[in-house]
Curated annotation (Swiss-Prot):
Homodimer. One of its GO terms (cellular component) is cytosol. Belongs to the triosephosphate isomerase family. InterPro entries: Aldolase_TIM, TIM_sf, TrioseP_Isoase_bac/euk, Triosephosphate_isomerase, Triosephosphate_isomerase_AS. This is Triosephosphate isomerase. It comes from the Bacteria. Keywords: Cytoplasm, Gluconeogenesis, Glycolysis, Isomerase. It comes from Kineococcus radiotolerans (strain ATCC BAA-149 / DSM 14245 / SRS30216). Involved in the gluconeogenesis. Catalyzes stereospecifically the conversion of dihydroxyacetone phosphate (DHAP) to D-glyceraldehyde-3-phosphate (G3P). It catalyses: D-glyceraldehyde 3-phosphate = dihydroxyacetone phosphate. The active site is at 102 (electrophile), 174 (proton acceptor). It is found in: Cytoplasm. Its main location: cytoplasm.
Amino acid sequence: MSRTPLIAGNWKMVLDHQQGTLLVQKLDWTLKDAKHDYSAVEVAVLPSHTSLRTVQTLIEGDKLSIALGAQDVSEHDSGAYTGEVSAAMLAKLGVTYVAVGHSERRQYHGETDATVRAKAAKALAAGLTPIVCVGEALEIRKAEQHVEFTVGQVTQALTGLTAEQAAGLVLAYEPVWAIGTGEVATPEDAQEVCAALREAVAELFDRATADAVRVLYGGSVKPASIAAIMRQPDVDGALVGGASTDAGDFAAIVRFRDHPA
């Protein structure tokens, strides 16, 4: 099955709404100059919640082909949950994608696999596409338990979903030891885990569902490393962190097919 690559930029807590607007404008100009085909490689940006409305207004007003994503979503529908943002609220803002279970949410906010499962379910129910993030810490990698660990995370996150729901989400493998450290998993490392995650989906549901799910790699993705990573058969895109806050770098990652083999 042919899966459309997705390059998603997670801005984290780096850009404010003004900086985000400028970045999206520069990104759009750069990709237009390159005659980028968004149907061949999809592009999404994930601003912080305070920038969503501003970026959404720009995307809709200028009819840009860049998709809008959010960095988190509540596991609750509505009510007295101070600081939370529901899936329905994000959907009303024109959000398409939402990251759930990012390693920084797990590390700093104590999110568990059960939390991730609940958030993914709420996102799907609201018509959003959750980007379910999984990944291992350095000690797990050194113990050679990384495949077992990440497969376990995916199994926990997807348990209770239907095959149709599972086919409508995106998985992202982010080796925690390679996030913000400058360390990059080799293309072979990325392929090993991404293939294992796809097999886990096949075991949970069926082969057709596994073939439909896009699996991204995230972990210090740079323009210099993206082409080799994207040549792997089970890697369908990238969840880009720091490099996504620079329009030139992010555009170069989006244009990975222009890079020499």
